[in-house]
């Protein structure tokens, strides 16, 4: 018995020593930042300068790798099942919260991923074609009550999908969901009028609105955007509590050593203070919300529970 305990003690000591040595040498090779969304979207745009700034803080290259698909779940699962050595990270967004309730997953992000740091939030805009007869939100709902209306999304269980489902549910109308591989892929059909409406994050939507090709008829934030001061919030339009937006944060496999987790957290928070990242966040109308890992992890679980509650109450139902 004593011999078995002794062997076990040696094994535990060896593991702890190896982990400590690994943390002391970290990072000694490039770090991969997986972006599980389509190229050209807000996550892709924000992840690049943040990765560069993190690399400068760590003294090692941090490069981005796009792994889109299934509303972000393919890339998230890849990271969740990667070695927990700090060399594979996830640049996550809202879909990491919503997928728990609205998608069939082969992993559980709540237990298989560890929050490293929170980054920012970004409001969304409800858009219709610039050529559409729909001039405001009331027009949209009236149209939905008398004819076929559809809406595009950046993919199943993404924010743009669930916001559309929430409008459909609360307006008690029938709206068909048409998923795309990223919001950018949906714009040609929206502009041409083949899609009735869609939600997109402010940074991606604003150039399209300013060009006149699409029309903004509502925003999802609690107050009007300074970039679109004439566009009402959904709260104003009779949809109280519709304060939903897209968040961004960084995660790692859950078994990552604490020392490495702390180094990454410091690097993310340092990156958020660099002029390059500050300017990039401002360019897409994102609000910086730096959060340490423990705080961000708690917030993430609360956000996940919020969507789970909406699913349970039937406030949001996924039709396809």
Give, region by region, the residue ranges found by the protein language model.
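N-terminal (or domain-start) structured segment
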Residues: 23-112, 148-150, 156, 160, ...
